Amino acid sequence: HRAIGLPMDSTYSAQHKMNLLEPLGVESSDLDLEMESSEEDQDYAEKLLKSVGSQAGKLQVSVSPVSRQPYKVWPAQHFAKLSDWLIESQGAQLYFLYGPGEEHFIESVKKEMNNDPMPDVGIPDLLQTRALLGKMDIHLGNDNGLRHLAIAAGIPTLGIFGKPSAVSWTPPGPTQHRSVEYDPGCKQSCTYPECEHLSCIRDVPVDEVHQALKNLLNDHIL
């Protein structure tokens, strides 16, 4: 038996776990998240979108401003600003996605918006949500499970990060998955839950996220 040293630099989480297996002779360079959806789930997603007024040719955007961890919740007013921009400037049809007990996050954003998003699509099950995300053109959201599903669905994503390292949770390589984070100087010595200001997420500049969103759209959609 021998101890395996753990790399201390920031590494994509999946790569980090694969690195632990290398001393055992297990190697892999395939880090792609894969989650197939059935024809039944695809039909469900298509009918759901049709029922709420989805229009072919319109930019389809999923937005997930939710998280059960306070250090992952970007302010509602910032999501509202970008949501309004997507609707007004890009003609987007915007869908808020959330899980059980997270409706209040959505309502907080809607109250700050000047435009109406698409009607609520409810809370589909996991595979139905994966199929729904596959119908989207792009995903914007906090660092949460829905972003991982969007990545598995193969659509471009933009994640907003607080306490966790963006490098650890954003697939390396292809530029269709991007992230924005802010370090107020204490991310490496975080004292959460003693931390009260949570500036690592609350102070992520909305202008930087806006620019990153524009770049992602220009590079992969428009």
Question: Which role does the model predict for each range below?
Answer:
Residues 1-222:
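Catalytic machinery of carbohydrate-active enzymes
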